[in-house]
């Protein structure tokens, strides 16, 4: 892991707070500016390690994978305050001063520092996808392909309600990270997913149902690697996704986006429902914007974007294969001209 850093001074949040931010990032594959750049936004418990042995999207990104690091320069920022690298000095305690849009603005500043003026694609799941939407609005000509997965351009009332409950747990529980994680797992999965996996079986050695043992495990696992301040911040970002806030109607805001927008929903998602995704897609079509809709079929709910890699690969391959073919074709033409 080689983390690189960008110092951003005097950043003004939507709430009017002035802060200094250390933005960390990793790159994979081709060197920046030598190949098409793909920006990958991580989700609530993720980080910039998107590929490789420890990569959370290693089944999608890597050598000869769907997003081929032999062909693309892959860039991933850490959301400031996510605790990656275990430097507690970079944690953000005043989490309510930040919104998803603030993070998108920080990413834009990071891209500027790296002299990046165009991105072949921005891809992200859940809150990372919400930040991707914000990026597309902030810089309408920046992104060729916008790929928000298991997310939407806004946090719904249902999502806000769950984030509110998460915030209550995080601020009032005696075991906040583990308890909040247990509740969150109920939103990330589905009843049929649990039935298929556990079917009311018991863990005799522990004297509990296997579903309870599984929830306890996930609570402890996150507690051992996550900071409380980080969880509070990420939950706040999830709650504040809204590209229309202070800008006008959805139609007015998205009409300026020049990206091809690939909406990818999950048919069983309880967090960002497929109905909301379809509505978004239909509105984009009505506005005659470049858009495509894909739907992951899964019993696993929201977490399907971290599970159903075969389906995601099938949806994404045409997007990334086309660029590879164009690049190869261009190289061939150049070689032919030189030969002549």
PLM feature segments, named:
Residues 1-37:
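Catalytic-loop region of hydrolases
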Residues 101-120:
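Conserved acidic catalytic loop of the alpha/beta-hydrolase fold
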Residues 142-221:
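Alpha/beta-hydrolase-fold enzymes
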Residues 270-279:
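Conserved alpha/beta-hydrolase "acid-adjacent" motif
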């Amino acid at each position: 892991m080689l983390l690189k850093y960008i110092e951003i001074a005097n950043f003004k949040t939507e709430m009017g707070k002035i802060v200094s931010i250390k933005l960390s990032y990793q790159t994979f594959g081709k060197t920046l500016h030598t190949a098409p750049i793909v920006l990958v936004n991580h989700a609530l418990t993720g980080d910039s390690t998107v590929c490789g042995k420890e990569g959370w999207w290693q089944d999608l990104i890597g050598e000869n994978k769907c997003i081929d690091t032999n062909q693309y320069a892959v860039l991933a920022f850490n959301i400031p305050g996510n605790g990656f690298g275990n430097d507690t000095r970079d944690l953000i305690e005043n989490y309510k001063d930040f919104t998803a849009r603030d993070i998108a603005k920080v990413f834009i500043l990071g891209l500027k520092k790296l002299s990046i003026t165009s991105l072949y694609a921005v891809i992200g799941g859940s809150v990372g996808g919400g930040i991707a939407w914000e990026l597309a609005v902030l810089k309408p000509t920046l992104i060729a392909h916008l790929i928000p997965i298991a997310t939407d351009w806004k946090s719904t009332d249902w999502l806000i309600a769950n984030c509110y409950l998460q915030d209550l747990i995080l601020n009032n529980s005696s075991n906040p990270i583990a308890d909040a994680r247990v509740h969150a797992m109920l939103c990330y999965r589905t009843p049929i997913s649990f039935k298929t996996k556990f079917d009311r079986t018991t863990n005799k050695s522990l004297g509990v149902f296997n579903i309870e043992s599984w929830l306890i495990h996930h609570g402890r696992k996150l507690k051992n690697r996550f900071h409380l301040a980080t969880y509070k911040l990420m939950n706040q970002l999830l709650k504040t996704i809204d590209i229309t806030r202070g800008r006008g109607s959805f139609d007015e805001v998205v009409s300026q986006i020049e990206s091809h927008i690939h909406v990818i929903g999950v048919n069983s998602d309880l967090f960002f429902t497929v109905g909301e995704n379809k509505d978004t897609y239909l509105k984009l079509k009505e506005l005659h914007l470049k858009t495509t809709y894909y739907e992951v079929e899964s019993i696993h709910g929201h977490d399907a974007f971290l599970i159903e890699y075969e389906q995601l690969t099938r949806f994404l391959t045409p997007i990334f294969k086309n660029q590879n073919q164009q690049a190869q074709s261009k190289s061939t033409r150049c070689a032919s001209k030189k030969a002549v």
